[in-house]
A protein has these predicted regions:
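Conserved ASCE/P-loop NTPase catalytic core
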Residues: 1-209, 216
Length: 218
């Protein structure tokens, strides 16, 4: 029996007005580039991000598409381009988690080289970036993420495209998402997340937000 996950209501979060405003602004205009939230444990960082799931709207996606492509848009993955007709279905915008220990293949996806060599066709195994397309990509403790994976995320977020290349075979798909990262300043003392490409930063202490304590955004 499938059980529904209970989320703390976004509207019930007390304080942290700057944090909530930063998240909502990114939902309204994803072109902002995401938000990096820094705060001690117990300051509702993860709670606020996960609470967004209940207030996100529904969008139209191509039925069966591994990347959630927009049936009304021009940016389509190779799978959609091969279809004779695109059927659309509605689903809610997703909040997709990226675990800190993820491998590169898990993040960007992988190509089945055996199928490519044997049958002469590309077979793509979607990764986290495909799941997060047109949604929110959430990285808890982003300061602990491998530097190479940080570069992968920032490149995909900036370009809006994820490209997987293996042995001369490539697959590109739309990768448009709001990148939300959280970090604990105590754990970040020895390893800071680099400041690159626009976005917002927010520092939270207790129930009050401190703009002076905000780190550089992603």
């Amino acid at each position: 029996m499938k059980t529904l996950r209970q989320r703390y209501p976004f509207s019930a979060i007390v304080g942290q007005e700057e944090l909530k405003q930063a998240l909502l602004l990114n939902l309204i205009y994803p072109g902002i580039g995401g938000v990096l939230i820094r705060g001690e444990k117990g300051t509702a960082k993860s709670t606020a991000v996960r609470a967004l799931e209940a207030i996100l709207p529904e969008i139209d996606v191509v039925d069966g598409c591994p990347c959630g492509c927009d049936p009304h848009g021009d940016a389509l993955c190779p799978w959609c381009l091969e279809q004779e007709a695109l059927e659309s279905v509605s689903r809610q915008v997703r909040v997709v988690d990226l675990p800190v220990g993820s491998t590169e293949d898990r993040v960007v996806g992988s190509l089945d080289m055996e199928t490519a060599l044997r049958e002469g066709r590309r077979r793509f195994e979607p990764g986290i970036l495909a799941d997060a397309n047109r949604g929110i990509l959430y990285v808890d403790e982003i300061n602990l993420l491998d530097d190479h994976l940080v570069d992968v995320l920032l490149d995909a977020a900036a370009m809006g495209v994820n490209t997987v290349e293996r042995e001369g075979v490539s697959w590109s798909h739309p990768s448009r998402f709001v990148l939300v990262g959280t970090m604990n300043p105590e754990e970040a003392a020895s390893r800071q997340v680099r400041s690159v490409r626009g976005g917002q930063g927010h520092g939270g202490t207790g129930s009050a937000a401190s703009g002076d304590d905000a780190p550089c955004g992603l």
